[in-house]
């Protein structure tokens, strides 16, 4: 069997983005109940990088509706392989740049740098470790590693919309993951 064929088979075998971890069907952020909108696995080539879940007040099927929905939101992650904090921060930066207009990215440069500093401050995410992002209107976005908040809330609604576009934008980190996040609970 030729190498391209083997690679294609490996990629196809991971074609569904079902998660390794079962995420809770509901959570609460700032006293507001949120529902699991969808969950999936981020692949980098054929390797599983992390499982991810998106929680919203009401289920949606489109990226535009998820981004536009008001109220608190939450993104939860479970690392599936060792990833350096710097690599994770840089991947977020690339995702922000690829999915947001430059003027908006420049406007939120301070928050973006703080986000990168949070992940770069951790030498590596180990398999099984968790991280999350919670957005609360009029407060901002709080980042959590292993359930512990990493500093004060950052940014505003527009900043969290930028963050959501990493996975829901026109050039998402992983198309299968985007589809899974918008597919509804398993």
Label each PLM-derived region with a short phrase.
Residues 175-186:
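Cysteine/selenocysteine-centered motifs that mediate thiol-based redox chemistry or coordinate metal-sulfur cofactors
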Residues 8-17:
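Hydrophobic h-region of N-terminal signal peptides that target proteins for export
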Residues 60, 64-138:
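Mid-length scaffold segments of soluble, non-membrane domains
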Residues 145-148:
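Short strand-turn-strand beta-turns centered on an Asx-Gly dipeptide
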């Amino acid at each position: 069997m030729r190498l391209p064929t083997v690679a294609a088979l490996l990629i196809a075998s991971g074609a569904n983005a079902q998660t390794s971890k079962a995420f809770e069907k509901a959570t609460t952020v700032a006293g507001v109940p949120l529902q699991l909108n969808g969950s999936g696995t981020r692949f980098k080539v054929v390797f599983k990088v992390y499982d991810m879940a998106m929680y919203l007040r009401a289920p949606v099927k489109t990226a535009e509706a998820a981004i536009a929905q008001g109220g608190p939101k939450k993104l939860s992650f479970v690392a599936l392989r060792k990833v350096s904090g710097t690599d994770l921060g840089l991947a977020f930066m690339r995702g922000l740049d690829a999915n947001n207009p430059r003027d908006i990215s420049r406007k939120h440069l301070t928050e973006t740098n703080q986000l990168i500093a949070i992940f770069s401050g951790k030498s590596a995410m180990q398999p099984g470790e968790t991280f999350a992002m919670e957005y609360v209107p009029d407060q901002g976005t709080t980042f959590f590693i292993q359930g512990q908040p990493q500093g004060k809330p950052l940014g505003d609604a527009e900043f969290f919309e930028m963050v959501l576009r990493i996975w829901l934008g026109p050039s998402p980190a992983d198309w299968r993951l985007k589809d899974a996040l918008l597919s509804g609970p398993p």
